[in-house]
């Protein structure tokens, strides 16, 4: 009943826009399709992946694209790049290497509570750069709960500090690499960025935001850290078979090396910037060939819905550009923000992206907003359009205030140890701080 009602309302709104908004016909088609898809994505009336599959159907039916063009976005090279990321993550998880890395970092951090907690955040951040934010949080949550038990905190503020730190570390560090979070891939595809390009932007930004996040949580929550020393936090002896670990580690190192140095290597062998995706496919072949994992295991671990969401998002992005709908919406935003200066324009755009992400899928938010703000940047001429779109794409991963904002938030809230009002209080401050940091970095360095 709810699904039918939402589809009916979104359909009527889309028709209302098409018939009553003063604009060119192609632009009206783009706006109507965007409205229909955006409402379904934001409300999740249908599964996100299913709504993504509606995009090519609608754009072809409306006469905006032909079938081949519409469906070609579901074979975009960035989708194969992310598929390779899923394969690497599946292999690390199968051989317990992810748990080993997390445990090793935490044990090495030291026995003082603050060092152990910072080690927990650091391990979460490192894993989240290579594994999905959700999977990372699922891995680290039992470790965090074990640490809380060892510390005998008996303080809700301290528990919230530890648990929210894990969720927020996963969210933030996901922007560190191109495969760390789905919005990265959407943004990179729109801006033609490869793995190395993204690394030079995402990694420094994550390195700034993680300490800022810890500082905000400490300031807002005022945790009472016990002064007792902690015994060994994680048992890692025998966790990984040495022979398998070496094989997986070598393949992982080769793939990451090729990604980082993709520019000179691809030029040397005469392949364009999509070389990163070819490396990801090679990684899958090597992992299966050397029997570190079976294809069925990769298939089970892969979130195929996310890959379909990429295709729908990229098709929607292309449609917005071709119909002029993104330019139409950019003009509206410009009229409200451009008169207040470039900094306010960037800050307003970033905070809007963060706000939308609190209520909608971060991937869907990026798919909708990046092309609009790319057009806005081109229209204003006051700020590099790629920089504005990049800032908005990164901000799409930064919902900290609500349990529904990101899956890591929901997992932490599900423990029952963090009240929603605590998450809102800490998340609101962090949203503002992160928005300002992203804006400053984008303004001066992007």
Where are these regions (language model features)?
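Hydrophobic transmembrane alpha-helices of multi-pass small-molecule transporters
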Residues: 1-81, 197, 201-331, 429-431, ...
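Membrane-embedded alpha-helical segments and adjacent helix-loop junctions characteristic
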Residues: 36, 49-50, 54-153, 301-306, ...
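Transmembrane alpha-helix interface/packing and boundary motifs in multi-pass membrane proteins
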Residues: 39-46, 123-132, 167-178, 260, ...
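Re-entrant/interfacial helical elements at transmembrane boundaries that shape
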Residues: 56, 102, 134-148, 163-164, ...
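Alpha-helical transmembrane segments of multi-pass inner-membrane proteins
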Residues: 80, 84-85, 89, 119, ...
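Membrane-water interface of transmembrane alpha-helices
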Residues: 91-97, 139-144, 215-226, 403-405
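Membrane-core helix-loop-helix motifs of multi-pass transport proteins
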Residues: 151-223, 234-235, 408-441
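C-terminal transmembrane helix pair
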Residues: 153, 199-204, 312-316, 326, ...
